[in-house]
Amino acid sequence: TGEHAPGVQAPLRDTFEMAHNALKAHGKAVQMLRAYGKQKLSIGFAPTASMCYPETESAEDIEAARKALFSLPDDPHNWTWNVSWWSDPVFFGKYPEEGLQKYEKYLPKITDDDMKLISEPIDIYGQNIYNGQCIRMGKDGHPEYVRRYEGFPKTAIDWPVTPECLNWGPRFLYERYKTPIYITENGMSCHDVV
């Protein structure tokens, strides 16, 4: 979007290529750490994404939240905060099929060697969790985003305050990726005086 430094708005195809190269760099870093580490290392990966949590603890709402978390948006300009696009290649050695179909015309050439490199085994999964979306099962059987009420708590930079995502996010991530989860970033911006 160009909102953050360096203020560049890259073409969509370039953003997918950048992401793919970042994942390849991650895989290469894992190889180098394993090859040259002087002791046994615990190596991880820490992307960031918006989590989803269920409106109620009904089985339907829980399944809807899980599905929403790992689904890819239809809008190709809104893929960057997605859990499965960044994490499935690392843990499963492949991009999500849903994303390959939705974003096909923007993707770089992806080789088997790329995916082997990207999926170098890791020991822990970090996730930067700041907020999330409340989800319920819609009447049509598809996940539905629950609209926030007027006056919903927000941080100083207008991020929603959603502590529920600190429970449900790691739970869903562990179910899918079967790797110890670390919350590597969390917090909220306030107008504090020290």
Please report, for each region that a protein language model flagged, where it lies by residue.
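Active-site region of glycoside hydrolase catalytic domains
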Residues: 1-194
